[in-house]
Amino acid sequence: MRYLIYLILTLHLTNVLANNSLNQNSNIWKDDWALADDFNMTIDTGGYSLPSEIAFINNPGKLPSDPLYFVLELKGKLKVVTNDRTVHTYSENILPLPQNLDRFDPVGAAGLCLDQKHGYVYVTFAYLDENGVYRNGIIRYENSPGRIGISPNSSTYFLDLFKDEISHTSHQIGPCVIHDEELFIAVGFGRIKNESQKLESTLGSIIRMNLDFKPLQDNPFYKNDNKIEARDYIWAYGVRNVFGMKLVGNRLFVTENGGGVDKFNEIIKGENYLYDGSDWSFAAKAEYLFSPAVGLVHLDRIGPDLSTFPEKFKDTFFIVSSGAPGGSGPGDHGDRSIIFFDYDFLENKLSSSPQHLLKFRGKSSQLPVSIEFASDGLYFIPMFPNSDGQSYVFRITYDINNNYPNKLINEINPKTLVSKYGCRGCHIINGKGGGFGPNLDNDLLARLYQRLNSEDYENKIKLLDQSENDLEIYKILRSNTMRNKGEDRVRSWLISFIQEPSFDNHLIKMASVNANEADATILADYLLKQKSDNKNNQKNNKIKVLISRYLPEPRYRHIIFSFISGIIFSIIILIIRLYFKRK
């Protein structure tokens, strides 16, 4: 028993030391996040546990003790941050019923929106009811009109509308937004995919009500029959899983998670968005599709009164991409990041392709989840602790003179570059890809070594160098290659080939991907390490397919469960080691 006490004291001391040394370790987290040029990122506040959303007060007071923004935590706490950056607990537990503390229940708080005029704070959530069934719900915290304090005066639950609907983790009730006296809320499809096509259920829909939870009579499916039903609340339906909502004037834009693809869309009153369980139906009405899926979460746009970013960003949407649940390390397809693109509000379409503002480059599991613009920058929340063990709210600012050390332009992840340059469109790499080009798995080094170090190849290069019409860059790349021998020549050749495929063969069919030398070097080193292991890959794939039949679809709850299980397992191992060391 005393070993357990020692362990608890040690963990507590470690936590205290970690908190006290925040300033000394202030640069560790920067290794986790790569940022675009002309931007800087700093820590605003810390000390959260699985934060899931941030929301700012529109017109905060000027005193140091006046509330500035709220941070919602997945497991039910709601915190408020004052101007002096003190973090207060606004509500200890937003859930209507006690949840089983003996197990990890994958339910929690999802959406957060504020109405300062009336002094309201709304939180959406999923919870286990008395029968152990997942249900959706909303709570409204009441403050004095015009002023939201650091603690509420009262609260009101709204549960009846959802009491007969079965929710589900990751497909639960989600974000909320307020326009004048109207409250919009997104509800995921739950467990049964075709629920999205039913007006008798709020599942898979956008619902609209007044600030007292009453349906609005101008809702498209409202029936004046003295009965309160789901159809009375529905604004649009046929959606799968909306994770982000943003009102621009009276127009409602959303980000939505699919199975294999995600989408950005505008929600129109009364529209059926056709989701019936397939990605084809999901994609039927989309303004922009992200393929493969990157886990789109919250989105925001700079308001007219927020001027910290330049004018060129005034019609730009910023979107958080959390990535595939269960993943760790940098995303291979641009996920675990913040994405932005320009939007033409007259033509109702994107006016630029998506680009990255921020990308995760850490080695651990991470889920970027929420952003919101304020008068002094873009605030950003990742759900899991960074490599220094802390959970922060970050602030991103536009600063052309910044000295932020970790920049996006210096990409170091070869898998990201494989995706960026579309290498798998033609080539098989690590068992995946197309078959139009040579397989890059099968002992590439050995295959190239013999050809590139042969007398025939050297004679071929001599003939090419005699040409007067050849591009100068080709001559430079050939010179770089031929000054090396053996494996060094193979590496140099591959770096040159990735930059300019025609540098030593003008008949080559491969098009240039415009890779720079730094990216080409990272790709070359990665490709030369690939091994031929097709039989093992096939065997492993069969095993994965067999196992996957008996496992649930991986979602956020599995990451959190694995995260907690890892901590518990580490503690058990440490106790065992202490016990045997004592013996």
Where do the PLM segments sit?
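C-terminal capping alpha-helices of c-type cytochrome domains
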Residues: G377-Y379, F384, Y398-N402, V490-F503, ...
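Extracytoplasmic electron-transfer domains, predominantly the class I c-type cytochrome c fold
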Residues: A109, N430, G434-L528
